[in-house]
Amino acid sequence: MPRTVFCQYEQRDAEGLDFVPYPGELGQRIFNNIGKQAWAAWLAHQTMLINENRLSPRTPEHRAFLEGELVKFLFEKDAQKPAGFTPEA
């Protein structure tokens, strides 16, 4: 039986993640409060940020930026698309 959490992103009960997806306290917060669909939405948003801003997850400054955007996206509903972003038709 899947684990259920109240997803703070979707503001409803949702299927929980199967594992802690991120290290540390933030990872535990995500595991306890974010559902699978919301996490998948973050991964898609993160990919867009990496591609549009030409970020490298290996660079500490870029990792810090992505972590800040992760918190904004999942918990603060304040994430924005990169400047000049236009989705493919």
From Swiss-Prot:
It comes from the Bacteria. Belongs to the Fe(2+)-trafficking protein family. Keywords: Iron. One of its GO terms (molecular function) is iron ion binding. It comes from Stenotrophomonas maltophilia (strain K279a). GO terms for biological process: cellular response to oxidative stress. Could be a mediator in iron transactions between iron acquisition and iron-requiring processes, such as synthesis and/or repair of Fe-S clusters in biosynthetic enzymes. It holds the Pfam family Iron_traffic. GO terms for cellular component: cytosol. This is Probable Fe(2+)-trafficking protein. Transmembrane segments: none annotated.
